[in-house]
Amino acid sequence: MAAKVCRSVLLLSRSSGAVASSAYPAFGVSSQRHQGTKTEALSMSLGGHQTVRRAHGLRTGGRCALFCHPSATLTAQGWKGSPSWQVQRLLCSPAAEDVSVVYQNGLPVISVRLPSRRERCQFTLKPLSDTVGVFLQQLQAEDRGIDRVTIYSADGARIASSTGIDILLMDNFKLVINDTSYLVQPPRRDLLPHEDGERLNDVKILVQQLYTTLRIEEHQLNKERELIGRLEDLNSQLQPLEKVKEELSKKAERRTTWVLWGGMAYMATQFGILARLTWWEYSWDIMEPVTYFITYGTAMAMYAYFVLTRQEYLYPDARDRQYLLFFHRGAKRTRFDIEKYNKLKDAIAEAELDLKRLRDPLQLNLPIQQIDTSKD
């Protein structure tokens, strides 16, 4: 009867010790020790080797409970006064992200921890106008310790520098700074509906027109200064060539005039000879066939001129042709660069035309002068 009572008390002590250790892990060790002492006292009354084994098993169970609850030991130390809970909180808290993307006032702000001084730097980008190349240039300009910086997509494909920031932030990407790679996960943003997209395009066009209207005067002044400077440069290059051209032109003009007067003298001499032979030396009956052949020979000469020059024999055209012949002969003799002279003249004419168009009343937003249709 006494042995049964001792066994029941032992079972109750085991169950109460387990409940206490599970509910109050901080007191698990003391409860196990108390239970072990109580068991040893009961084993002395029983006097059996089996009870000693049970007590040893309870001590082993107490040790298992101690090693299975590391938080209980830390909590017990915390109750003793050491700030282990703060250390545990620091070890368990996640590390700050090196690269993050947030939106502030509608603009993406990329925060990057620079490798030189390990400081976070924020880069505010314009999604519509900035590109990946602009962002990479800003990174290298901010930290001189960055030798290589590239951006890759999530599948490892390199993203071109001309890609827009709005396209880049649509999906995850990898930012590689020197030998360190960062996985960037930008926040998701809903795409605009079709109607809102059209309104946004209209706003873009309106802003561009407003910018053009406000900057048109400054642009025209800068363009006018540029054209005037170009004209001055071209004129300075043309001036020495113009002097040589004037000398050659005068010589060619003088020789052409001599040729014209020589033709006039030839025709006058021919008229005098034919008149002398017709009325003083011979009669008209004899000179008529001669004058016919002279006229026919002159017609053949004019036809030969057309065959050679592909131009009709007209006095102004013949005179200009003779002038050009004399001019080119003089240019070849003096090594005058006619091609360069013509290019400079064309460039000056084009610049003057652009300047005239720039100063047009329509370009300056001035009222147009009305055409007076009334007759005097």
Swiss-Prot record:
Membrane topology: Multi-pass membrane protein
Location of region: Juxtamembrane helix: 309-314
UniProt catalytic activity: Ca(2+)(in) = Ca(2+)(out)
InterPro entries assigned to the protein according to its UniProt record, in alphabetical order: MCU_C, MCU_fam
GO-annotated cellular components: calcium channel complex; mitochondrial inner membrane; uniplex complex
Motif position, Selectivity filter: 284-292
Binding residues annotated for Ca(2+), in chain numbering: 288
Protein name: Calcium uniporter protein, mitochondrial
Annotated gene: mcu
